[in-house]
């Protein structure tokens, strides 16, 4: 029986393989969540550069939020990331949820980024 870590690594690689097949040069919106925080970044895989990033560890978000581990925090990160992406000139991205299911905080971040103007 595979360990939990092995299962997560296999799931993340499966998701990334699907993303590479449909990306067509679009940057990737990568999401990582821990038990206390959520992080998101837009990565240009062709150039190997991070275009925009946001997380609940940033001082302005950290002071405004009660905790970094709820859907309100994920929504704030999604809106901030969409704002930074539009300043950088990025509109179309591919959503990379990694090994995390599209539910709860990951879904809240994605919906807030869509409302902020990102297309995926």
From Swiss-Prot:
One annotated Gene Ontology cellular component of this protein: cytosolic large ribosomal subunit
Keyword Translocase part of the UniProt annotation: no
A GO MF label: 5S rRNA binding
Keyword rRNA processing in annotation: no
Any one Gene Ontology BP term: translation
Subunit details: Part of the 50S ribosomal subunit; part of the 5S rRNA/L5/L18/L25 subcomplex. Contacts the 5S and 23S rRNAs.
Family: Belongs to the universal ribosomal protein uL18 family.
Protein name, per record: Large ribosomal subunit protein uL18
Organism: Sinorhizobium fredii (strain NBRC 101917 / NGR234)
């Amino acid at each position: 029986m595979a360990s939990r870590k092995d299962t997560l690594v296999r799931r993340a690689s499966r998701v990334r393989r699907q993303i590479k097949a449909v990306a067509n040069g679009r940057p990737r919106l990568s999401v990582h969540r821990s038990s206390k925080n959520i992080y998101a970044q837009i990565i240009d895989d062709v150039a190997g550069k991070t275009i925009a990033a946001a997380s609940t560890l940033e001082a302005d978000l950290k002071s405004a939020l009660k905790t970094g581990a709820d859907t309100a925090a994920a929504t704030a990160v999604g809106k901030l990331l969409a704002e930074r992406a539009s300043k950088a000139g990025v509109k179309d991205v591919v959503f990379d949820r990694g090994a995390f299911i599209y539910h709860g905080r990951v879904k809240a971040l994605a919906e807030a980024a869509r409302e902020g103007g990102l297309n995926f």
